[in-house]
Amino acid sequence: MKNIFKKDWIYLLLLVGLAILTFMQVANFRFGFFTAYDEAYFLLKLQEAYDMSCITGKSQWNLIAVHWFPYLDLTSKVNSYLASSILIWASILVVTITSCILFDKKRIIKYLALAWLFMFGLGGGLSYVPMQTAVLCWALCAFLLYHKSEIVWKKSLYAVLCGICLGFSLFVIIPAALVLLVCVAGLIVLSHWSDWRKMLLYIASGVVGVLLTCLYMHIIVCPLGDILEAMLFTATYIGKSGYKYDGVSFILQYGLFFRDCLFVILAFVGSYWLSKRVSIKWLGGIVYVVMILVYTHYQVKPLISPSMFMMSLPLIPFLFGKINNLKWNDLKKADTWFYIFIFAYPLLASFGTNTALSGRIHCFVVAWLFLWLEYEYKYPQENYRRVYIAVLILFAMPLLDIIKAFENRDDSYHFTRGNKHFAGIALTEKQVNYFNNVYNILEDYNYQPKQSAILTALYDYCCLYAFDAVNAANYHQVQNFHYFPKENMIAPDFIFLCKWDSIVMGQELKDMPWGWPDDFDRYYVGTPEPDNASWVNHADLETRHLYCRKSLKKLQ
């Protein structure tokens, strides 16, 4: 034991540092609220799951979440962040245990530190992102253990576990789960092509795992018929809108992604060629990093961030080693395709959402940790210190974000007139002034929490959450409004619209039997977002107006 601590002292220091930063991260949970985008939307989805008043969306992550965390009120931002962190911490433990089984049971400190490092900064509020990150991380670990094991019953057990995890993924993000199920089944077929009995046994084991998840969802969470109906309902109206969910958008996004990947390959080949012809072994890595930084600086809207480009740096020794030993016939072997699958896992797991690939891939790069450990395990004589430094540099951004957020905490401003959970969140002065101003207007029109209906789009879900309002329609994006079934909407007492919303939805709002805009008073309310916020379009949000039904106004 003494030798282990002596050997892994640097990882002990890393664990202490990560523990301190994680404590700071947890301490920041009740500070700040991103009012412009999805944070309030996800909290409202969790409230919807508790109410079970309606089941909407192609993803049922919210239904799963409230059953996985029965003792936490997930409509609280703090509890939502805590639940998300629990999923990530559980994934770190699963990766650590898997690494011990695959490589060296005595190096648990090392594997825990590296797993924590590779998943550091993930989490945030509970949504489909940390849910998908967790279940696909567990599925990856189960498949790695399946690949490693030689005992039939163990392989079958791991195949069942992999199927269970991918089954949950089917109810979170369907496309990614389907792609991974096909890849896993293909690798099983390729590995046992000569023994069809084992091939059928392992595929059947995976299918049993998926069916067990479906049984759990049907009995514990919600009847499958209701879930499928909700998925088809949402897929129909969102698919018709074509906003980032249509085939052309996916092809364009992945085409631009592979454009960037092509440059990565060229940079990698160039650095590999250079490293074979000079005596300074690390020169190729430096050239690679410089090329990536120059490319991302001058490229217009790169689909991969510089940090994601550089994330592949620790894999260079592994890939160099594989290329040196690779022969043409090796492409026929299942092991070769297994390593290709693990390398491509972050991309495959990111399939199926309209969010940027660079942000999604980062959630699954723990797959690359296993490639790195595999190479290190097979070639222990290599010097990895420079690679460790490179990995630490990659995680400087979340580290700096946590420290900056911790330093800038201000507990002076709270909005206490609406949702009790929102009252516990520390906001900026501008946000509190915004919510107080809007709430004053609402009160002039006899606003009643949990009774008055508000129609809004993505940018104003924060008001629905803060004011405890009834959501008039669950259409989410303004681009989806045209195809959203209007019979499912509640006649709103209040409407939030910015200029872009009015352009997209204006004519249809006039056609609705609500009397808009003639029967509504109009108030300019602006935006609660910071003036220097890079994540919002201020030219659009500064045009935000609140419409209040005239008949509800209090008599002066």
Spans of model-derived segments:
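Membrane-interface alpha helices of multi-pass inner-membrane proteins
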Residues: 120-121, 155-174, 180-185, 207-208, ...
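Transmembrane-helix motifs of polytopic, lipid-linked glycan transferases
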Residues: 82-105, 110, 138, 272-273
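Short hydrophobic alpha-helices at membrane interfaces in multi-pass membrane enzymes
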Residues: 107, 142-168, 196-204, 280-287, ...
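Perimembrane helix-loop-helix junctions
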Residues: 1-5, 148, 179-211, 215, ...
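Short periplasmic/luminal acceptor-recognition loop of GT-C membrane glycosyltransferases, typified by
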Residues: 400-483, 492-503, 538-539
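Loop-to-helix entry region of an early transmembrane alpha helix in multi-pass inner-membrane enzymes
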Residues: 59, 63, 72-93
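Extracytoplasmic catalytic/substrate-binding loops of multi-pass membrane glycan-assembly enzymes
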Residues: 27-45, 53-68, 74-75, 224
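Aromatic- and kink-enriched transmembrane "portal" helix at the membrane-lumen/periplasm boundary
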Residues: 76-81, 113-135, 171, 292-306
